[in-house]
Amino acid sequence: MKTLKTLKIFIIVFIASVSLASFAGFGESCSSLPTTSDGYLETDTAYGYIIRNIDMKDPRGNCNSVASSITFCFKNVEGSSSPCTMYTLNEGDSKKISDLSTDNNPDLGANPVLKNIVLTVKKWDNDLCLVMPTSRGPMPVACKSLSATPTPPPSEDKNCNIGKSCYTGANYSQSLINFSGLAVQCLSETLNKIFFAGKSCSAQDQNSRITNLAAFSTFQGYLKRIIGAALILYTMFFAFNMALNTEYASTEKIALFVIKFLFVAYFSIGLGPLDFSGGQPTKENGMLKYGLPLLTGAAPDFAQMIFNAAGSRGLCQFDNSKYKDGYKFYGLWDAIDCRIGYYLGLDLLYNIDKNRVLGNVVGNGPRGNNTPIPNFDPEGKNDRPKDLSKAGALRFFTVMFGFFMAGNVIILAAGLVFSVIFLSILLYFITHYLVCMITIYVMTYISPIFIPMALFTRTKAYFDGWLKVCISCALQPAVVAGFIALLITMYDSAIFKNCEFLRYDYERGDIRFSTFELRLPVGGADKCQESFGYKMLEYYAGKGWEEHLLILFPIKSIVRDVVSILAELLCVLVFSVIFYYFSKSIGRFASDLTNGPNMDAVTASPTKIVGLVKKGAAFLKDAAMASQGKPLVGDKPGVGGKRKEGEQQGGDLASGSGGGK
């Protein structure tokens, strides 16, 4: 009997053990899981507890390496009909533990600490794993091997060092001619990738010619110990002062100590981890979260605020509400690009939809006369040059050539000088803004070096200098923008006088743009018709051109309103020369006003550009004289000979006086 009972107990224990092994081999994975060196996650956190409640080695073929899904058995509550419930999740699927514990297991799905943990299926090296967030980053709780090494997905950002807006930035502009806003956005995104993104190009990319700097977080890590030592020294010095002087124990001193301590820690190495998004602990750095956006955003905001107060009524004034979020700064640069195109006679900005092929438009602005002025499709269009009919042509230079063919060289010279000075001043503003933006990014990148210097009296001057440069670079573009706004106001008043402009807004998918149509004001229409800008638009339309025969070749020139055009253009030229000479000191004025560095040495100043134009003109003149066999100006006896003779006499006198000593 005893033998029979013993055998019976043995059979029951064997069956129970086999069933437990078959249906509840919890904590087993098809592939080995990574382990931590101290075993902390596996023993003392929810990570190890969840591993011990998952079974993968079930007799149902869960370890199949061909399937692109993962199957596992999740433990049920004690006393359930089945020890666990099977689940199959595809790659990329995510489930909360509360969704997997269908029977409200109080140890899992109903546990307030565990129920909101998200399990995600993703590739982990050569395995497909069920991953959960931990304090040390995402970690797998169950894995299986794949049949072959997966091919890495192609990177979405093929141009890893170049901002995406360098290729798509034109879609955010409302001006049909846009290059300055595109340059600003392209440079901003590229600097952000180089300094802060922390994603370098693949080592196999042989076409890459730009090497990323270490990411800002990596750079912070290098200085973490140094900054920590500075904070410890600061605390020790303050404690010594409190022990030796009771005045340091006051509430004011203690509050100032705490504020400076937190300021340096938050803006230099960051506080945290404050965010566990995706299980990855991240630090919150005040310089990246508040400092950089504030400094880079202040420059265009101040500049646009001043710039929008200038200009003619309705000309190149875009609707700011139609810019996408994060791209409203394009309004400033669109206004500049639009005026460049409008002053130089770009047809696209004026009559883009004369055949109404774009559908409905919305007109905004003062309407005045309801007839478009002038008519861009005159009956005598055969008299005008063919260049005026080309889309996208800069008609200003075609009209200047028409005056030249009529013998009006002074008008041609005045027009070319105006265009060179106007473009050089605007180019100076653009380059000045870009240099200031680059400086702000560099100052932000090296901020972990200078911010801790605010703790000590002997090093605070370095911090003050760093802060001074940052604030100055944020304000200098606003000062230069005020100068440009005044220039634009004077140009609009001199060129278009009291003319008004009607804006037409177009939308084609995600692309939005506007054109501007000149309209006569209700009162004082004669003054607008006598303006230089109105007459130039008539020339662009083909009015005022005459055809003549020069020997055997027909030429087209402009002989109408020559005197009035010359007077108006000379008035514009006077303003241009005044602003040209004033632009020589605007950079120094902006630096003195903001108490920062002078950027003229690294910008395209108008004087440099005009100097290059002068050198080019002198070179062409010398080349023309040399081709005709004439002596150059410096080789003439009446000029160069006297100068050389005087130099020789001066040298003889100097040598004679030296010998007499």
UniProtKB/Swiss-Prot annotation:
Subcellular localization(s) per the UniProt record: Cell membrane
Keyword line: Cell membrane, Membrane, Signal, Transmembrane, Transmembrane helix
Region (Disordered): 629-661
GO cellular component terms, semicolon-separated: plasma membrane
Topology of this chain in the membrane: Multi-pass membrane protein
Organismal lineage: Bacteria, Pseudomonadati, Pseudomonadota, Alphaproteobacteria, Rickettsiales
Signal sequence extent: 1-24
Entry coiled-coil feature ranges: none
Family per record: Belongs to the TrbL/VirB6 family.
Membrane-crossing residue ranges in chain numbering: 226-246, 254-274, 410-430, 436-456, 469-489, 562-582
Main localization of the protein described in the UniProt heading: membrane
Domain of life of the organism encoding this protein: Bacteria
Entry keyword annotation includes Cell membrane: yes
Name used for this protein in its record: Uncharacterized protein RC0143
GO biological process: protein secretion by the type IV secretion system
